[in-house]
Amino acid sequence: MVWQSIIWVKRNAMAMLTDITKKDKNPVQRMTTGFLPAKITIPLCQEDGFECTSSVKPGDSVREGQVIADVSRDEYGSKSFGAAKIHSPIPGTVTEIKSCTYPNGKQGKAVEIFLNGSFTYLGKQQTVFDWKNYSPAMLLRTISEGGVINTFSNSSYSSFEIEMNKIKDEKDKKLVIRLFDEDPSCQADSILTRSEFEKIATGIYISAKILDANEIIIAYAKNAKLPAAVGIETKELFGSIPVTFIEIDTRFYPCGGKRELIK
């Protein structure tokens, strides 16, 4: 009886979530109000087993988005595969480098920052990044500075820069993009696809340029309409790189993993 009740609750919660996302075409625009604490603690380990090295010290002033911890390297000078640079989410002053308990229960180092000063990005109009005039090497360096990681794998996250470096010299590269939810209980991918497709498309092109991909394959849910639904021409987005859009029947689970997409 208890197990049946849990299933009933989960199904109803899923139904409510689906209903909300269908009624509001772009719910992301509503999520604009946030709480800013006076002091924050940022762990130097963002992925289990990979602790970054702090590049700031107590008393330092930091800007919003400034790198405060860099990727640790092994004895041979190679970067840790799962690590990426850590940035300050707020402007302020570093009060101390201290030990803290991570969300996984382990102890480790962290940077404590007291909120102070003006924001660089929050609430400000962003400048357009002139990425089309960047070389693949410059784009990869920018990605490294941005601390971009790949969250596709459920088991662990990895540095996008290091993953790109591992495969960019291979031949006959096809870039496969999934624009639907791998897990139907988490609708983040589909929500972002509807609300931020132009930005996603730009990211796809940047990735293809870095990899020198000879084809882009975009997998999307069968009931979705892309790219016509967002009023964008494929040639405008991806230039001379051939693009193939493939419908995926998302009624069956799993359908969005690496193996399923390749099949």
Model-derived segments and their meaning:
Residues T120-S156, N165-D169, K174-F180, T244-K263:
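Phosphate/diphosphate-binding glycine-rich loops and adjacent basic-rich segments that engage nucleotide
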Residues A84-Y121:
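Hydrophobic or amphipathic alpha-helical targeting/insertion segments
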Residues M1-S55, D70-R73:
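N-terminal, Lys/Arg-enriched amphipathic/low-complexity engagement segments
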Residues T41-I42, Q46-F50, V62-G65, D74-E96:
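Generic structural motif
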Residues S153, N214-K263:
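Hydrophobic alpha-helical positions that pack around
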Residues V56-V62, T101-Y102:
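Acidic, glycine-anchored pre-beta loop/turn
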Residues R194-I210:
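Histidine-anchored nucleotide/phosphate-binding helix
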Residues V67, R73-D74, S99, N116:
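Short, surface-exposed secondary-structure boundary micro-motifs
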